[in-house]
Regions:
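Short intrinsically disordered terminal tails
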Residues: 1-3, 62-69
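Short amphipathic alpha-helical "recognition" segments used for binding
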Residues: 12, 42, 66-68
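General structural signal for alpha-helix termini and helix-helix connectors
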Residues: 19-26, 41, 45, 63
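An amphipathic alpha-helical micro-motif enriched in hydrophobic residues
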Residues: 28-55
């Protein structure tokens, strides 16, 4: 996959989260923070380890950048 697909997936997640809340879509730091908080709530409710998910996501991100840190 390429960056465009990753970015579109993230934008779609932000738009859907805003829609569920009855808000206009936003693509700024506040919107990203809200979505991350929503994901923390989901992890807590379903007994998933958010910190582990975040670490794995960071590894995936580095791999997708070609291992550049």
């Amino acid at each position: 996959m390429n960056d465009r697909i990753y970015i579109e997936a993230a934008r779609a997640a932000l738009a859907r989260a805003a829609w569920v809340r009855g808000e206009a879509p936003a693509y700024n730091e506040d919107a990203i923070s809200d979505l991350l908080a929503d994901l923390r709530h989901l992890c807590a409710a379903t007994d998933l380890d958010f910190s582990r998910c975040d670490r794995v996501a960071a590894m995936h991100f580095q791999d997708e950048l070609g291992g550049v840190s």
